[in-house]
Amino acid sequence: MSFKRDGDDSSQLNVLKKRRVADLLASYIPEDEALLLKNGSYACTVCHHRPVFNTIDMLSVHRTGKKHLGGLQRYYGKKLEHKNEIQKRRHFDFVRAEDAGEKPPPGPAPLLVQTKRITQNALLKSAPYNSCCSNKKVVANSRNVYDPHSGPSTTTGLNVPLDTQPGPSQPHTSLHSPPTGPCSSPTDEIPPNKNNSRHKKKGEEKFRKEIADPERERNMEHYLQLKSSGWIPDGTGKWVKDENVEFDSDEEEPPALPPS
């Protein structure tokens, strides 16, 4: 889609081209220069005061400022010094191993490692997410549920030694240990939950019926075909033409559902 502009000023055209390129490259920010926070904001990792921005457009405007450009030079200067220091230490270890007559372990070629990383990223369906914010949450439950197949239960909040064996005169008793006797067994005390299994079976049967229903599948295909052809529902159960779509024919009614 192209937009008309007033006048034939070449400078104005260049300004529009530059703005368009800047908009397209706004999201092209290296992963180590920005940080995605838990609340959806963006933090600049280049500047020492870590400014936070609500949108990526505001972050792009900040990246064009003088303070950020100055901090960018210092940031990459420190990274270059760190890289040179690592290379010097590796060279020192290599020379020391040669003087001692030892054979240094062969390491992967840097160019080969870089090529392999680029190839792996190119084969991915989406860009690899790299951020310090982790969505994994570990939920600790202090209550213990007895499982007959897992043996004796263990407590989360109490430090109970497991290697101490109770003597014959002092039987070991616990609130979480199941009662033992000739008339009771763990499997009898904890019957399987039949309601959950019934609901699960009903849900699976309903899902299979929806998948195997040809009428529903035909209706879905017809709906998708109308949407792709430029027809939109008006909310009353009827289909109307989209004003932003050009139609080849002058038909006022959408194509009907084909017979089965």
From Swiss-Prot:
Primary location class: nucleus
Biased composition range(s): Polar residues: 166-187
GO molecular-function terms, A-Z: zinc ion binding
Signal peptide: none
Biased composition (Acidic residues): 245-254
Motif (Bipartite nuclear localization signal): 4-20
Transmembrane segments: none
Alphabetized UniProt keyword annotations: Metal-binding, mRNA processing, mRNA splicing, Nucleus, Spliceosome, Zinc, Zinc-finger
Compartments, as annotated in UniProt: Nucleus, Nucleoplasm; Nucleus speckle
Region of interest (Disordered), ranges: 143-260
Matching PANTHER family: SODIUM CHANNEL MODIFIER 1 (PTHR32297:SF1)
Stated role: As a component of the minor spliceosome, involved in the splicing of U12-type introns in pre-mRNAs.
Assembly information from the UniProt record: Component of the minor spliceosome, which splices U12-type introns.
Protein name per UniProt: Sodium channel modifier 1
